[in-house]
Amino acid sequence: MSGHNKWSTIKHKKGAADAKRGKVFTKLIKEISVAAKLGGGDPAANPRLRTAVDKAKAENMPKDNIERAIKKGAGGMEGVTYEEIVYEGYGPGGAAVLVEVMTDNRNRSVSEIRSIFTKANGNMGEAGCVAWMFSKKGLITFDKGLDFEQLFEAAIEAGAEDVSEEDEQFEVTTDPSSFIEVREALVAKGFSFANAEVTMIPQTMVALEGKQAESMLKLMDKLEDNDDVQNVYSNFDISADEMEKMM
């Protein structure tokens, strides 16, 4: 399995997605509001907002919640100022970790994130210590069952950089600037995607097992549980056999 969606696959298998839906909604509402504040409340003219709204719809967020979040952001979010920060560090076994934070209190966030790293036998590093290990890309995944050759041809024609076949899905990779264009071109041709997002893809992977693997999953869980954290990326890899031992 390719590593860049390893964590999302593990979360799905653990059944964590439904259990934490309320927290997911909270993070999405924050992203929608900030996107609307920065780029306006029209998703058609604001790519960041459009992506956030599409993600919220994919999580089955009620339409009213989405509209309220847009209205709040477009209205200026009086009295609330969020700062976007990326923290970097190392998890167990030297796995690289990127943590995207949206916070109204930088001091609180850095203290909490540092504590989470330390308790999981990791450590928070300086800016730039691991960012170079990742590339920002658009990633569109499709469940198997459709024709790979047709998807490949349509995706490349639409401007995708690569199309690959993984263990459980087909993956279309794009430049971030052409992500929405490629996604909509594929939808227009009848391809229904399982997930679509702009993400950070690691260039190399770090294999973990045993206690290190367990500690890494706990670190990822704790980071995502933090209210200020929007996204977490890592280059760890845990084999299917190792996952079976931990489930």
From Swiss-Prot:
UniProt keyword annotation of Oxidoreductase present: no
Major localization listed first in the record, in broad terms: cytoplasm
Lineage: superkingdom: Bacteria
Coiled-coil ranges (or none): none
Subcellular location(s) per record: Cytoplasm
Disulfide bonds: none
InterPro entries: Integrase-like_N (IPR017856), TACO1_YebC-like_2nd/3rd_dom (IPR048300), TACO1_YebC_N (IPR049083), Transcrip_reg_TACO1-like (IPR002876), Transcrip_reg_TACO1-like_dom3 (IPR026564), YebC-like (IPR029072)
TM stretches of this protein: none
GO cellular component: cytosol
Key words of the record: Cytoplasm, DNA-binding, Transcription, Transcription regulation
Protein name: Probable transcriptional regulatory protein Ppro_2673
Species whose genome carries this gene: Pelobacter propionicus (strain DSM 2379 / NBRC 103807 / OttBd1)
Lineage per the UniProt record: Bacteria, Pseudomonadati, Thermodesulfobacteriota, Desulfuromonadia, Desulfuromonadales
